[in-house]
Amino acid sequence: MKNYEIAAMDKKELLSKIKELENRLADLNFYQAIEPAQNPMVFRNLKRDIARMKTRLTQIDRQEKSNA
């Protein structure tokens, strides 16, 4: 997911997308125990997307606190 796509999301969308990606990562980790992944870069990309979204969520929280 691109940074501009993440920046366009609001807080609720970010929270739901983070939860969705974390569930997907957990599923992939489970299936990796059974059978090795064909593309190991999927894990790295998912973790990076989750980190980007959490960073954006923190930025939104800080903006809300400074505006309040």
Swiss-Prot record:
This is Large ribosomal subunit protein uL29. InterPro entries: Ribosomal_uL29, Ribosomal_uL29_CS, Ribosomal_uL29_sf. It comes from Chlorobaculum tepidum (strain ATCC 49652 / DSM 12025 / NBRC 103806 / TLS) (Chlorobium tepidum). The gene is rpmC. Disulfide bonds: none annotated. Gene3D superfamilies: 1.10.287.310. One of its GO terms (biological process) is translation. SUPFAM superfamilies: Ribosomal protein L29 (L29p) (SSF46561). GO terms for cellular component: ribonucleoprotein complex; ribosome. The lineage of its organism: Bacteria, Pseudomonadati, Chlorobiota, Chlorobiia, Chlorobiales. Pfam families: Ribosomal_L29. NCBIfam families: L29. The keyword Ribonucleoprotein applies. Keywords: Ribonucleoprotein, Ribosomal protein. The keyword Ribonucleoprotein applies.
